């Protein structure tokens, strides 16, 4: 039974992220003869949602909660609920209240202004089975998963232009996240859902269970990374987290263009040692007939997303500025094999999804292990030389 939290304290706000500072506009004594060229744009200026108010009253005051399961997130079931006043349908996700759950809700709330990210409507703090829980009310996405929609389209050909438009939609979600210093880190087929079954439905990114804030914390002293030395301004942990999303874009784009994944397990395991090796070594191909009509430019775009070295992967800005994405209306309407292959391999699709889930989990673990060493532990030869000299001077001073 759901009930309101103990006490009737006012709603608890999440702090709203500060807007990025705007550079002052210099005053011009005379208008220039020609307007100056615009500065190169790294990210569009996005509006970030203001602070989230967590409601303390019982959710059943406002919504009718049903037992209809809409889906399974990494942290539990998503249920169908109805607004009692408007009868509008929504999705309810329940998280046991803890700092990690609050971070997930906060990051998702910040991002839910984006048209290609599932929108949070309300958040409640209620007791459920004697435990304090966060109840997240989200818009209901009725259109099903991205690849199920392509599987179910019958004889209608799926084209390269459609693949480009889909990748642009997913890219817009990632661009929004990266621009406000959030890495999703779990971009995969089952987290990409359509708003409805209609042809004009919008594709949206869901499930922020692994999302992470990526604000860089540069130190005055140069840290050392394992397994190699590099300055923090060149490589911060945030580069790894964001590169995880770019790798996902590469895998999804590959599947969209042919119907099967670039990496696969030979032995029916969720992720076999061989598959891990192929991912780490970047071993994949563009075999015919599925790839025969796909341009070399598009294959190169995939190669730049699936680079084995995370820091060499394309950034989201580079991806969104690529002609295949930016000018998606000009992409040829070449019929692809995707729909046929997805239908033929339908029984294998759950394995494909499981493999990608495992690959992303492995990647997150690998990147978490790249920790900054303390300055005392650093093996920087210059620091070692300076320390040796300091110790020699200290010893000389003590001797006198």
From Swiss-Prot:
Its EC number is 2.7.11.1. ATP binds at residues 70-78, 93. There is a cross-link at residue 353 (Glycyl lysine isopeptide (Lys-Gly) (interchain with G-Cter in SUMO)). Residues 64-325 form the Protein kinase domain. A motif (Nuclear export signal (NES)) lies at residues 356-365. Its main location: cytoplasm. It is found in: Cytoplasm; Nucleus. The active site is at 186 (proton acceptor). Residues 328-364 are annotated as: Autoinhibitory helix. InterPro entries: Kinase-like_dom_sf, MAPKAPK_C, Prot_kinase_dom, Protein_kinase_ATP_BS, Ser/Thr_kinase_AS. Keywords: ATP-binding, Cytoplasm, DNA damage, Isopeptide bond, Kinase, Nucleotide-binding, Nucleus, Phosphoprotein, Serine/threonine-protein kinase, Transferase, Ubl conjugation. Residues 1-43 are annotated as: Disordered. The keyword Kinase applies. Heterodimer with p38-alpha/MAPK14; this heterodimer forms a stable complex: molecules are positioned 'face to face' so that the ATP-binding sites of both kinases are at the heterodimer interface. Interacts with PHC2. Interacts with HSF1. Belongs to the protein kinase superfamily. CAMK Ser/Thr protein kinase family. Stress-activated serine/threonine-protein kinase involved in cytokine production, endocytosis, reorganization of the cytoskeleton, cell migration, cell cycle control, chromatin remodeling, DNA damage response and transcriptional regulation. Following stress, it is phosphorylated and activated by MAP kinase p38-alpha/MAPK14, leading to phosphorylation of substrates. Phosphorylates serine in the peptide sequence, Hyd-X-R-X(2)-S, where Hyd is a large hydrophobic residue. This is MAP kinase-activated protein kinase 2. It comes from Homo sapiens.
């Amino acid at each position: 039974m759901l009930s309101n939290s103990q006490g009737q304290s006012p709603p608890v706000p999440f702090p709203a992220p500060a807007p990025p500072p705007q550079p002052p506009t210099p005053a011009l004594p005379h208008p220039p003869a020609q307007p100056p060229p615009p500065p190169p744009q790294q990210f569009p200026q996005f509006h970030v949602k203001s602070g989230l108010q967590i409601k303390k009253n019982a959710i059943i005051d406002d919504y009718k909660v049903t037992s209809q399961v809409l889906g399974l997130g990494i942290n539990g079931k998503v249920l169908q609920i109805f607004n009692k006043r408007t009868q509008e349908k929504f999705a309810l996700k329940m998280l046991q209240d803890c700092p990690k759950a609050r971070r997930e809700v906060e990051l998702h709330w910040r991002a839910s202004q984006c048209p290609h990210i599932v929108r949070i409507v309300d958040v409640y703090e209620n007791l459920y089975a004697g435990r304090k829980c966060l109840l997240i009310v989200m818009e209901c996405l009725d259109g099903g998963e991205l690849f199920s929609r392509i599987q179910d389209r019958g004889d209608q050909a799926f084209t390269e232009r459609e693949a480009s438009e889909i990748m642009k939609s997913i890219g817009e979600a990632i661009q929004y996240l990266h621009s406000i210093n959030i890495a999703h880190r779990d971009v995969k087929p089952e987290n990409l859902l359509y708003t409805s079954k209609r042809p004009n439905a919008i594709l949206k990114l869901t499930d922020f269970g692994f999302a992470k804030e990526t604000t860089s914390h540069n130190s005055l002293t140069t840290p050392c990374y394992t397994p190699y030395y590099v300055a923090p301004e060149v490589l911060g942990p945030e580069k790894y987290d964001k590169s995880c999303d770019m790798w996902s874009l590469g895998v999804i784009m590959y599947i969209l263009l042919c119907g099967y994944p670039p990496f696969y397990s030979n032995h029916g395991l969720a992720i076999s040692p061989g598959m891990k090796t192929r991912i780490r070594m970047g071993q994949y191909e563009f075999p015919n007939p599925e790839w025969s009509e796909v341009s070399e430019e598009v294959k190169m775009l995939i190669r730049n997303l699936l680079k084995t070295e995370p820091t060499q992967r394309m950034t989201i800005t580079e991806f969104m500025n690529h002609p295949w994405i930016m000018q998606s209306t000009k992409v040829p309407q070449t019929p692809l094999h995707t729909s046929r292959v997805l239908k033929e391999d339908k029984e294998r699709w759950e394995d494909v999804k499981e493999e990608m889930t495992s690959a992303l989990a492995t990647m997150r673990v690998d990147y978490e292990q790249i920790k900054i060493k303390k300055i005392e532990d650093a093996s920087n030869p210059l620091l070692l030389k300076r320390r040796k000299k300091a110790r020699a001077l200290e010893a000389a001073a003590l001797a006198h």
